[in-house]
Curated annotation (Swiss-Prot):
It comes from Neisseria meningitidis serogroup C / serotype 2a (strain ATCC 700532 / DSM 15464 / FAM18). Homodimer. Keywords: Cytoplasm, Glycosyltransferase, Purine salvage, Transferase. This is Adenine phosphoribosyltransferase. GO terms for biological process: adenine salvage; AMP salvage; purine ribonucleoside salvage.
Length: 188
């Protein structure tokens, strides 16, 4: 049974996200979603809020970004009765892959997807836990496009608006939906 979004507010999710100062480094206020995932009530709320948004949007596949996007994306795909595709850090997938690099604060990283994961013309929803600079999500969107997928939307629980990731994603031509927006993960 779905929890109707009006039964609990999105603000309840915000209250459940744990804030940890100076982690993983000094000056960062880390937003930890594990309390949401640990609670059957709040995890259901999170998934149901997304199900209600996407249940009538004719999605063919949900893709999730490594690693928390797997948790949210797989649960969402199950409820939408569609398949799930993992987009993993480079070197973690066993079959033929296509890769996309993206910039980090110091250096570069890459994500990969199996070459047969998205059929041309498939309508794809890309999911992650949060959007900071947007680099990982932009790389995931590019992988889906390389395989011929049509981006329905990119979705996340939380967007740090001051880091411009959401703006960059929207500028790439992909719509972005986030349940919560926050000024940022940098301590002021």
């Amino acid at each position: 049974m779905l929890v109707h979004p009006e039964a609990m507010s999105v603000g309840a999710l915000a209250d459940k996200i744990r804030k940890i100062e100076n982690w993983p480094q000094k000056g960062i206020l880390f937003h930890d979603i594990t309390p949401v995932l640990q609670s059957a009530e709040y995890f259901r709320l999170l998934v149901d809020l997304l199900v209600y948004r996407y249940m009538d949007q004719k999605i063919d596949i949900v893709a999730g970004l490594d690693a928390r996007g797997f948790i949210i994306g797989a649960a969402l795909a199950y409820h939408l009765n569609v398949g799930f595709v993992p987009i993993r850090k480079k070197g973690k997938l066993p079959f033929e892959t296509v890769s996309q690099s993206y910039a980090l604060e110091y250096g570069e990283a890459a994500v990969e997807i199996h070459t047969d994961a998205v059929k041309p013309g498939s309508r794809v929803l890309l999911v992650d836990d949060l959007v900071a600079t947007g680099g990982t999500m932009l790389a995931g969107l590019e992988l889906i496009r390389k395989l011929g997928g049509e981006i329905v939307e990119a979705a996340a629980i939380l967007e740090f608006t001051d880091l411009q990731g959401g703006k960059n994603i929207r500028a790439s031509g992909a719509p972005l939906f986030t349940l919560l927006q926050n000024e940022g993960c940098m301590k002021g």
